[in-house]
Amino acid sequence: MKKNKKNYDIQDRLLFNLFLDSAARISAIYSLKISQLNLDENLFENVREKEGYIVSIIFFNETKELIKEWLKIRETNKITNEFFFVTYYDGTYKQMTKETIRNRIKKIGKIINIDDFYPHSIRKTIINIISNIGNITDGAILANHKNSKVTSEHYIKHQKQNDIKNRLIDLRAKAGL
């Protein structure tokens, strides 16, 4: 996502990128702390997720550069709150709420003409892409699912019957049937 300060700020860009890079759940992103950040490894470590699982939240180099920029802004503005995402309210910086995170992502959706755009929309999309390019196991690993059954049932876009038929025709032709 390119810089456009008129429509969104660095925390918007970081939220979008982290959801896209990691396919993390909102509860994980919401709970990120500065102390969990490992810039050398491009991840947040020991993040509590759904059902108490501890996971790593990965990110890539573009996001790493945004994080460095955000850390400088935090230092300049003397933001000492332990949470990575913060809002300024009533004269102090506080942990950004899940609702604020949802609203920020929804705002990005409106910019690109998608009305029902939420953090989970990004999660489902990237899991679908990875599962289609790689395989269902890759999608399950990215999603931090216990097994690929959950990924298959709830995250993977199901193919249309015509697509399945065409794929079977191709496979049969390759097999000489």
Segments from the language model and where they lie:
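Short, polar N-cap/turn motifs at the start of nucleic acid-interacting alpha helices
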Residues: L37-L39, N135-H154
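DNA/chromatin major-groove-contacting recognition/catalytic segments
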Residues: I141, E153-L177
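Basic, Lys/Arg- and aromatic-enriched nucleic-acid-binding interface segment
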Residues: M1-I26
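Residue-level marker of regulatory loop/turn positions in helix-turn-helix DNA-binding domains and
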Residues: N7-Y8, L18, F59, T97, ...
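C-terminal catalytic core of tyrosine-transesterase DNA break-rejoin enzymes
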Residues: N17, D21, R123-H145
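Short, charged phosphate-coordinating catalytic segments
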Residues: F19-E41
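Short, leucine-enriched amphipathic alpha-helices that occur as contiguous helical runs
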Residues: Q11-R13, K98, R102, R123-K124, ...
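Basic, alpha-helical nucleic-acid-contacting "clamp/cap" segments
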Residues: D40-E41, E49-D90
